[in-house]
Amino acid sequence: MVLWESPRQCSSWTLCEGFCWLLLLPVTLLIIARPVKLAAFPTSLSDCQTPTGWNCSGYDDRENDLFLCDTNTCKFDGECLRIGDTVTCVCQFKCNSDYVPVCGSNGESYQNECYLRQAACKQQSEILVVSEGSCATDTGSGSGDGVHEGSGETSQKETSTCDICQFGAECDEDAEDVWCVCNIDCSQTNFNPLCASDGKSYDNACQIKEASCQKQEKIEVMSLGRCQDNTTTTTKSEDGHYARTDYAENANKLEESAREHHIPCPEHYNGFCMHGKCEHSINMQEPSCRCDAGYTGQHCEKKDYSVLYVVPGPVRFQYVLIAAVIGTIQIAVICVVVLCITRKCPRSNRIHRQKQNTGHYSSDNTTRASTRLI
């Protein structure tokens, strides 16, 4: 009598054991592809200052003079950046757009102290803050040239006439009479409305400087944004003594073009746009949002999955490649295991059961035949 034997375990697992080593491959790749500290020269001074950054103590100044940045040529918070085989001094200051004017020791006015330090870095010369606010314009020196040195009366006349040109005006000596010329071009200045001390609104700080030059009076910035009366200056000098006479026309053109632009929203709109910048148009009462890449919606609250992302640089490309390889291997392993279970295992069970049934049927028939013969 043949006893029934329980079917053996799925033999497909034995076949699939050969693919288990593939699961260890991603871990191996991660171990091999660990970020290795390069022996090349660091790209900036900040790399040497980070705890996990470059070890700059092993560099010899005498052996790497070509690649080391001389502190005498890159001062005032500048950073040495290696581009190819040369090293240059880079001044990358993250200055905000706050308008807090300061006057530098070089006689130039800057939007705030950060821009003053950036200019000192670019010029590689020391620039100190002389006073808060814009610099007062330089007046004529009054020193006569070689032509007028012999005539004290002529020199005194020219000095007193040129002294009236202030607030950025230049003295035109070639004219028949001495004119104060305002050679200030604001056509390339960005739109940033401001309220001036004369109670009028201007499209940018350059127009305030131009109006101060035209009127020959001190006009300063009082606040960001337009004044409460929301008026824009369109007047020109009353005495008509200046060379430029198109100030009113230019102001009107700038006012018309400004209506098509957007200005930043006031502070009470902070948080209006979740992933973007809040902008306010002159013709619109409600603000609008300029969403960042990858976001959409009225408040930039929705994720836009249709955005095509730029391929990363060579530094991060190896990590993207490793991630892609790992993902591909994992998908392949899963597919192999699924196919092995769904196809190989049922087929092996069917063959094994058929053999058992065949053997059992033959033994039973033989027993019955021998009984009949007896």
Curated annotation (Swiss-Prot):
Feature: compositional bias, Polar residues? 356-374
The ranges of region (Disordered) come to 353-374
Q: Which residues form the signal peptide?
A: 1-40
**Protein topology in the membrane:** Single-pass type I membrane protein
BP-aspect Gene Ontology terms: negative regulation of cell migration; negative regulation of integrin biosynthetic process; negative regulation of stress fiber assembly; wound healing, spreading of cells
Q: Report the function annotation for this chain.
A: May be a survival factor for hippocampal and mesencephalic neurons. The shedded form may up-regulate cell proliferation.
- Subcellular location as annotated: Membrane
The organism sits in which domain of life?
Answer: Eukaryota
The record lists glycosylation at: N55, N230
Keywords per UniProt: Disulfide bond, EGF-like domain, Glycoprotein, Membrane, Proteoglycan, Repeat, Signal, Transmembrane, Transmembrane helix
Q: Which GO terms describe its cellular component?
A: membrane
Q: Where in this protein does the record put region Required for shedding? A: 303-320
Tissues expressing this chain: Widely expressed in the brain. In the olfactory bulb expressed in mitral cell, granule, and glomerular layers. In the hippocampus expressed in hippocampal cornu ammonis, pyramidal layer, dentate gyrus, and substantia nigra pars compacta.
Q: What is this protein called?
A: Tomoregulin-2
Provide the EGF-like domain boundaries.
261-301
